[in-house]
Amino acid sequence: MTTQLDSLRNMTVVVADTGDIDAIKKYQPQDATTNPSLILSASALPQYAPLIDEAIAYAKAQSANKAQQLIDAEDKLAVNIGLEILKIVPGRISTEVDARLSYDTQATVEKARKLIALYNAAGISNDRILIKIASTWQGIRAAEILEKEGINCNLTLLFSEAQARACAEAGVYLISPFVGRILDWYKANSDKKEYAPAEDPGVISVTKIYNYYKEYGYNTVVMGASFRNVGEITELAGCDRLTIAPALLKELQENSTALVRKLEYKGEVKAKPQPLTEAEFYWQHNSDAMAVEKLAEGIRKFAVDQEKLETMLSAKL
């Protein structure tokens, strides 16, 4: 029996959106993505205790300063979890920069270089890592610098066409346009509470971005993220990559309904437009209330979970 997950793999690179090693072993994705929230939930799993202990020992060996130890411990823990995942996935791990640096280009660049150095020291080459950065103007500028250094980036918390366009123009390796969080916003801010997959505003957003990239010949990979239901995933079959949580991977694996490719650009490739200026980026992005609210909220939520992780690590330092 061919499952929907099997069919999806034939047209889209399937990525696991989790830090749970057991789930990754079960569904055998090509890549895996983590974020501060997933690192926090993974850290509560008993099999991760040795990784936390090792990160604490590493941090204590680096510095006698408690504040610095905390920074080093959280960076090392994120990398330790990534290293475990890389033992299973054949492709790449996405490890996220501290969300509190989202509006600081230089600090983002420095944090990314540090994470890469930790992976490199463990014998992992750059081509197996994506550095995840929020799609702020400052984050996109940081990614532009990093890409030129051979450090590939995954630009996340992407909700607007302006963000997508600026990422492509910066030569970013991959973007993660969010689907489910867009749907959440429309449900909360309109009278319409139910959406068929094809009319789901998150699905429409990713479809537009995918077609725009293909129409203008951008090489940036489109990886749909943040799904609320299987319908959103099947409606984006054919997208370059999709990063999917274990619960939805399970649903796809248990369903054998035929899957039809939905995304495939067959038109001609046009000349690229002039890159957006900073002023144009902010005008276009800020014209989309959903994108403004969801980007800010996403950064806040990741920062809260980063702080919870710090509280847990502080108790051990």
From Swiss-Prot:
GO cellular component, one term: cytosol
Pfam family, one: TAL_FSA
First-tier enzyme category under EC: transferase
Keywords assigned by UniProt, alphabetized: Cytoplasm, Pentose shunt, Schiff base, Transferase
Recorded metabolic or biological pathway in which this protein acts: Carbohydrate degradation; pentose phosphate pathway; D-glyceraldehyde 3-phosphate and beta-D-fructose 6-phosphate from D-ribose 5-phosphate and D-xylulose 5-phosphate (non-oxidative stage): step 2/3
E.C. number(s) listed in UniProt: 2.2.1.2
One GO molecular-function entry: transaldolase activity
CDD domains linked to this entry: Transaldolase_TalAB
Subunit structure as annotated in this protein's UniProt entry: Homodimer.
Function: Transaldolase is important for the balance of metabolites in the pentose-phosphate pathway.
Protein's name according to its UniProt entry: Transaldolase
Source organism: Haemophilus influenzae (strain PittGG)
